[in-house]
Every structure is written in C-alpha cells, then in structure tokens.
Amino acid sequence: MNRTAFATLAAASLLAAAPAFAAEVTDQQAAAPDVAGRAGATAVADVIVTANRSAQPIERVGASVTVLTQAAIEARQTPAVAELLAQTTGVSFTRNGGVGTTTGVNIRGAESQHTVVLIDGVKLNDPSSTQGGFNFGNLLVGDTARIEVLRGAQSTLWGSQAIGGVVNIVTAEPTEALQGSLDAETGSRGTTYFRGGIGGANDRLSWRLAASRYDTDGFSAYATGTEDDGYTNTGLSGRLNLKITEAVSLDLRSVWSSGQNDFDAFNGDSREYGKTRELVGYAGLNFDLLDGRFRNRIGYAYTDTNRRNYNPATLVQPLTFDAAGENRRWEYQGTFAVNEALNTTFGIESERTEMRTRSPSAFNLNPAFARGQADLDSAYAQVQWTVLDGLTLTGGLRYDDHAQYGDNLLGQVAAAWALNEGDTVVRASWGQGFRAPGLYELYSEYGNLTLRPEEFDSWEVGVEQRLFDRAVVTATYFNRQADNEIRYNGCSTPSTDPLCTVNGVGRWGYYKNVQKTEAQGVELIGRVDVTERLNVSANYTWTDAKSASGVTDGKRLTRRPEHMANLAADYDWAFGLKTGLAVRYVGETFNNDANTVVVGEYTLVDIRASYPINDNLEVYGRVENAFDEEYQTVLNYGTAGRGVFGGVRVRF
C-alpha cells in the first residue's frame, strides 16, 4: 500500500471519529469494540471490566481497555484470536506462516513476552518458551464469550511480564436452564471449523461443556515454497459453579487443546511438524461476608504446556525439540467495599514455575533435559476511591519475593474523571513493571545465570468525548521506558566471549542484558452511528518503539510497525441481512536490529455477511484478503491469500 493510500485510511479514521481530535482510552473500546463491528456495542456506563481483577464500570478505569463482546466476536467471524486482537488499537502480531505456527502479539510496541495472557483469569504464559511468552498460534476462538485487552504496564495486579498489557479471555457461561450452541464452517484451503457447547443454570448450579475441531490444508509457511503446511487443533473446555450456600460457592474450570502444525525453516520448504498440548485448570472457593461487601476467593491454578517438533527426514532421530512448562499458583483475593465511594482489592499469591527442554539430533540422540525452576511469592493491594462525583482515583502496590532475584516493590496510580454527565472522560495512569529472567533464558542451552531483571516505567494520558449520542472519539498518548531488556546474542566462531563457551564446548549464542528501549505513541479511536442501520468505526496507532543504547541506539525495534490503522463499516438491512467491511493497514517494519532489512507495508480487506433464517439458525460468510494482497509479517514467511468461507450457527 502506498503512502497516499495510507493517508486516505488515516484520514478515514479521523473522519469516523467525527469533529474532535481527542480521546481514546478505555471506553470507546467498550462503546464500540474498536472496529469489531456494531454488534456488541453497548453504552459506556453499562460495560464492566474484569481485567483489573474486580468488576467495575469502565468509566472508573484510568487505564486503556478494549472489550470485545461475544456479538462482536461472532460478527467478525475470525477463528484465530491473534487476528481478532489485531483489529484493536495498539496491537500488532507476527506469525511464521499460517494459523498454528509460532505467533507473537505485541501491545504498544512491547515484546511479545511482555503480554500476559489469561483464560478466565488463569495465566497461560509458557515458562519453557524462549523468553517465557505465550504462543498465540494455537489459540482459537473456541468457546470464547468475551475478550478484554488492558494496555500499558499492569504488573501491580498481574505481576511479572504484564509490561505491554494483559489479554483476558472469558469463556461462555450459561444463563438458561438448558442452552447450547453449534457453529460449523468450511472454506478455502480445505479448511473446516466446528465448535459447539451445551450447558445450563439454575439457582444452585451452572455448568457448560464445549468442544471444537479445526482443520486446514494451509499454504507454504516458507514464502516462496510449493508444499502446503497444514494444521489441526482439537479443543475441550468445561466449567462448573456450585452455590453451596447463599454466600459460599465452588468454581471448577478447565481448558485443553491439542494442535499439530507443519512448518518450514526461514530458507526453504521442509517436512517438519510440531505438536503442542496445553492444559489449563482452576479450582476455587468463593465466600462473601458482611452482606456481600467483603468478597473472598481462594484458588489453585495450573497450566501445563508440552511441545515437540519432528523432522521425518532425519531417520535416526526424527525428534528435534522437546519442551514442557508448568505453572502452579495458589492465590487468595479479597475485595472490600468500604462504602459506595471506596473499594479495595488485595491478595497474596504463591507460584512455582518449572520447565524442561532439550534438542535431540543425529549427533546426540538422547540429550539430557535442561531444567529450571523458580518460586515467587507476592502480595498486592489496590484502593479505588471516588473522591467526588465523576472523579475516581486508583492506587496500588505489589511486593514480589523471587527465589533468585529477591524482593521488589512496584507501584501504580491512575485517575478517571467523567465530566459533562459522562460525555467527557479524562484518564491518566502511571505504572512500573518488573520481569525476572525467564527459565529458558536462565537454564536452557542458551541460558545465562548472570542475567538481571528487566525494569519498566510507563504512563499515559487520554480523553474521550461522546458527541450527539451518535459518536465517540478517544485519543491517548503513551510512553514507556525500559532498562536491562534481555536479548539473544549470537556467538561468532571462533569467539573470545567467555559466555560463548560452556564446559569447553562452544555454543550458538546466549541471552544477555543488552538494551535500553523506549516507546511512545498515540492511539486514536472513533465510532459514529451514521444512521440507525449504518455504523462506522476506526482506529489508528502511531508507535515509535526504538533502542536507546549501544550500537543500535535510535534504531526501531524489529517487527514493530510505526503506523497501523483499522476501518470498519457495518450495515443492518431491513430484511435481516447484516453486511460488513473491514480494512487493516500495517506500515513497514524492520526484520533486523540494524534496520537494514525491510518488511513491506500491506493492506488487507475483508468482507463479511450474515443472515438469520429464524431465531435459532443463522448463515454467514466472509471473504478474507479480498484483493489477494501479497505480504509478510516476518521476512520469508508466507501469509494467506484470498480465502472464501461460509458457515451456519445454531443457538438453542
């Protein structure tokens, strides 16, 4: 896409935002889940945000939050969560091929490992991954009912890694005595996606079971390759809530997935494939005191990720990679409403993370696992005080005691001021971040036990304006400073670097603290109900993320676009048909630290439609990448061309 086209799309973002050039922040995203479409849009005061650990009206939140409702998710029709998130403000992603391959999500230019990912409040980040981040490659919509994206440093409440932000995925809960859902679709590249769930609720018990299956022949993960790289994913989930008494209840939840994806190297086709299994479990006891003013939760959360890669061409030892990561967390959380104006949230956590990893080869058929373990005990507290009508102040502290890195204290403050009967909302927040080195960075074959923790400071200020009961515009400026960021450092041959040799044997490289980085940017969001049937929404993000030290001082961080924009228009026809158009622009990025290798800009256009046959049955379809744009998010890795998909939804 040329600069003129980009300027046109950016201008459309501002026009959709209507007369004022002000205000992003958290609410617009609730009022119109960014550009996810009109479906699911609700009034600001009605939206409850749980991403900061306690339900509250979004106009009282001082940070930036995007909320995608179930209606918005269904309207978008996108199976992959990473692609859904990319339609929201400040979010970009990279992927080494098609759905199922390694996928990283960046929020506000932060590293992918600086995003904490949750399912129903349980952390998913894999301690055996290269820098402890979460691979979005296997995360499909499944039984998702809601997605909340909290942007900016959130380490006070969510701990280590919550630097760029938090993504909280909420699974569906039943509201009727018996209800179910079934979605089935098929389309290009031999793709099929089936998902369904059934559950029920009464005064004492609610339950739901869900399953999904995704299959695709795919396309070559190597950009100029000729063989298709397919992907399959099977998912299961379940949840149960039992009300023991009016004040005591039991929660049980679990999510399981198993995926297999073909993948290529960066320089050509291969027959390699990987298998990933992920298990998430939670058990919790909830009890209320003081007529519900004092709510308590004691819980145990467990995640287990197992990954294996195979190369059938290596007959002696086809297994080329074997890793597993586990998180075990005991937690207590309390919320106490002192009065209508003053609320507190506090808790303690004890977490153990473990990982093992090895890389067999024809030269070493059965190497020993590199193993690592870390224990972390934490306590946090947050106070939210509505000082006067419309003005809410929030402050919090977190204390971490890390087995290897000792104690650390973090702080965060925020303010939200609703003016003009809520039509104008001003927000500001400041927070600190802290990330201890991951287990892979410390103990793998590339590990370095001398690593220091990463430290961050971030702040933002924004304003939202509602106009004529038809439009919302928001604007936010953000800034983040980082010290001691950890990067992979390659070793030359021969090398005089002592860390390039372990037990007398040279290695490819190791992790080290090499960098200060800084990021600043502007996020703009707008939505306007042009008519009762036509809704237009848009967002634009400018991100200046760059190195601030060493030989790369002033260079942009790799694979972080400076410009991103989304535009969507949705029309509800009088006879029931719903149609929508979505346009996404991503500016050029650099594929290396020296900024000498460019990955080009691109524009994607998607078209979607749905039609209700009756109250229980709906048909839908979409065209992805309608103009068959050729593009890459990572150099030399392929992306999907034009695709046509159609399906049915059944609700009962």
Short names for language-model regions:
Residues T50, A82, A86-K123:
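Extracytoplasmic beta-strand/coil segments of soluble accessory domains associated
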Residues M1-T88, G200, L242-E246, G281, ...:
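N-terminal Sec signal peptide and the immediately downstream disordered periplasmic leader
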Residues D34, D229-T353, V472:
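Outer-membrane beta-barrel domain signature, strongest for Gram-negative TonB-dependent receptors
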Residues V81-L84, T103-N106, T115-L118, F134-L140, ...:
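N-terminal periplasmic accessory domains that precede
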Residues S155-T156, N168, T175-A177, D183-E185, ...:
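Periplasmic-side early beta-strands and strand-to-turn transitions of outer-membrane beta-barrels
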Residues V25-Q28, T386-L393, N479, G506, ...:
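Gram-negative outer-membrane beta-barrel transporters
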Residues N267-D288, A323-R328, G372-A374, S429-D483, ...:
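Outer-membrane beta-barrel signature, preferentially recognizing the C-terminal barrel domain
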Residues K123-R151:
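Short acidic/polar hinge/loop motifs at secondary-structure boundaries
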